[in-house]
Design a protein with these regions (language model features):
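DNA polymerase processivity clamps
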Residues: 1-8, 15-70, 85-200
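Short, flexible active-site loops
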Residues: 76-87
């Protein structure tokens, strides 16, 4: 989490000696991701992780990574993931991604906002920039709830869409001022994402 977004991912583990909670530095996570995606042994997808009060050691067939842990207690993240949200948007992942990419043409380092206008059968996307340029797009969707408008950081939405593996995605809202819950469109998603809204 960075205060604007939060991700939760769960995976199956075997041979657990105990359950530990720790905070791993971002640099260590990035290095693990690089090794597992680039140099993974095709015959084994297993990784062994050991944790004590100060360090983490991760081992694959060919690599060992050791990292110091971040001291402190991680916030109670499960309270951030709400349930029974009244506004539910379902749409095709690739259509949504393409529309966001078209909107991103007008974005810059200083401005990356996009406004989503939610209706029963369509999602309208709008973006503007300081040069008074404006982009608009519309895609089909299924939406349950009162019509509403909410703004988000384009880059944050695209990053989440890129890692969701199902054909469709779900966005769930309470109000336009609270975080959006993004998941795959299945009954028991193993990964969940919260993105906070922004003014656009």
């Amino acid at each position: 989490t960075d205060g604007h977004r939060l991700a939760l991912s769960e995976t199956e583990a075997t041979d657990l000696n105990s359950i530990s909670t720790c905070i791993i530095p971002r640099k260590c996570i990035s290095e693990l991701k690089r090794i597992l995606t680039t140099y993974s042994d095709e015959n084994s997808n297993l990784i062994t992780i050991g944790v004590n009060s100060r360090n983490l050691v991760a081992k694959t067939n060919n690599y060992v990574i050791k990292s110091k842990l971040i001291e402190g207690k991680y916030p109670d993240y499960r309270k951030v993931f709400p349930e029974n949200l009244p506004h539910v948007l379902k749409l095709n992942k690739n259509n949504f991604k393409s529309a966001l990419q078209r909107m991103s043409i007008l974005s810059s380092e200083q401005y990356k906002g996009v406004k989503l206008s939610l209706n029963a059968t369509s999602l309208d996307l709008t973006t503007t920039n300081p040069q008074q340029e404006k982009g608009e797009d519309k895609i089909d969707c299924s939406y349950t709830g009162e019509p509403m408008e909410v703004g988000f950081n384009l880059a944050y939405l695209l990053e989440v869409i890129d890692v969701i593996e199902t054909d469709n995605v779900q966005l769930r809202f309470d109000t336009q001022d609270t975080g959006c819950l993004l998941t795959s469109d299945d009954n028991s998603p193993t990964s969940k994402y919260i993105i906070m809204p922004m003014r656009v």
